[in-house]
From Swiss-Prot:
Its main location: membrane. InterPro entries: Prenyltransferase, UbiA_prenyltransferase, UbiA_prenylTrfase_CS, UbiA_sf. It is an enzyme of class 2 (transferase). It comes from Colletotrichum higginsianum (strain IMI 349063). The keyword Transmembrane helix applies. Its EC number is 2.5.1.-. Diterpenoid pyrones display various biological activities and higginsianin A shows anti-HIV activity. It holds the Pfam family UbiA. Keywords: Membrane, Transferase, Transmembrane, Transmembrane helix. Polyprenyl transferase; part of the gene cluster that mediates the biosynthesis of the diterpenoid pyrones higginsianins A and B. The first step of the pathway is the synthesis of the alpha-pyrone moiety by the polyketide synthase dpchA via condensation of one acetyl-CoA starter unit with 3 malonyl-CoA units and 2 methylations. The alpha-pyrone is then combined with geranylgeranyl pyrophosphate (GGPP) formed by the GGPP synthase dpchD through the action of the prenyltransferase dpchC to yield a linear alpha-pyrone diterpenoid. One of its GO terms (cellular component) is plasma membrane. This is Polyprenyl transferase dpchC.
């Protein structure tokens, strides 16, 4: 009986971290892209001892660190929002909102995941600047649920800003996994700025479309969300958010000198984003969910494109 209850609790904890869904994988994309392409660039340098195996090893560590920390962030979000979630149709069955997991159990689970994520970063970065890479995303994750409150809206702060930062930040960690021992923290930030900016706006775009599914319930409860800034012009807002994506991505790709990436990343993303904007229907909030899924597929595709780039560099 006790074993059965433990298994049920473990399943609920996995659900609490969204490990039963694809959403946490979004937090791994920027780190994986950055690690793979930094690894490819390092391999292309003269007298480089970087191997394909090392690149993939660092890539795996970056994935685990990001995935675990995302799980911790999901728990924190639900811990803060449990009373709100209990009154929203889409979220009322979440483990904390429904009472399947207690607040104490959730907090212990969150701390465990955050500690494991820190440990993985220690290994990946060889102990260098771990706090500098961990604290910014931790602080943003703590603030995220409060960005949905009415006070945040009055201050011009929307939760999508904070979420976008947390999803873009692993790009910095990914580059540090390859170049961290060879360049300063400030230089890593500078090199990652175009990619981070691109991912920042990409995340706001896809999350604005995704959260628009809850527009009816959110307006009843006064939940703050970025689509509020557009009013009835949500479609125009999404178009505006796509624009900086298509500006920053070429800036990042220009330094990599890869025709393959221009075709497989810039080309595919441009076509896909255009198709998404055509298919989005403001009168059908559920259409925001299809944009979310389409961008998940784009993220997976881009990982594969970056893997190919590593092998192209390794064989050159």
């Amino acid at each position: 009986m006790a074993a059965t209850k433990d298994r049920q609790l473990f399943r609920h904890l996995l659900r609490l971290s969204r490990f039963d869904r694809y959403n946490p994988l979004f937090t791994t994309f920027a780190g994986l892209w950055s690690t793979l392409l930094a690894g490819g660039a390092k391999m292309a340098e003269q007298r480089s001892d970087m191997s394909v195996a090392t690149v993939f090893q660092q890539c795996a560590l970056c994935f685990v660190a990001s995935y675990l920390f995302c799980g911790a962030g999901m728990v924190w979000n639900d811990w803060i929002d449990r009373d709100i979630d209990a009154n929203v149709a889409r979220t009322k069955e979440r483990p904390l909102a429904s009472g399947k997991v207690t607040a104490t159990e959730a907090m212990v689970w969150m701390v465990l995941q955050a500690a494991l994520s820190w440990g993985v970063l220690e290994v990946m970065l060889d102990g260098k600047d771990v706090a500098k890479h961990f604290i910014p995303v931790a602080a943003a994750s703590v603030l995220y649920p409060f960005g949905k409150r009415s006070l945040a809206r009055m201050l011009g702060i929307y939760p999508q800003y904070i979420l976008a930062f947390t999803i873009a930040w692993p790009a910095v960690i990914g580059r540090a996994a390859i170049y961290g021992q060879y360049e300063s923290y400030a230089e890593t930030l500078r090199q990652c700025l175009p990619l981070c900016t691109m991912v920042f706006f990409w995340t706001i775009y896809l999350n604005t479309a995704y959260s628009y599914q809850d527009v009816v319930d959110d307006r009843k409860l006064g939940v703050n969300s970025f689509y509020n800034i557009a009013g009835k012009h949500i479609h125009l807002l999404l178009v505006a958010l796509v624009s900086p994506i298509l500006v920053c991505l070429p800036i990042y790709l220009f330094e990599l000198h890869s025709l393959w990436l221009w075709l497989s990343w810039m080309g595919v993303w441009t076509a896909s984003l255009a198709q998404q904007l055509v298919q989005f229907d403001p009168k059908q909030p559920a259409s925001g969910g299809s944009i979310h899924r389409s961008n998940f597929i784009l993220g997976i595709w881009t990982i594969l494109a970056c893997v190919v780039q590593v092998f192209l560099t390794g064989s050159a």
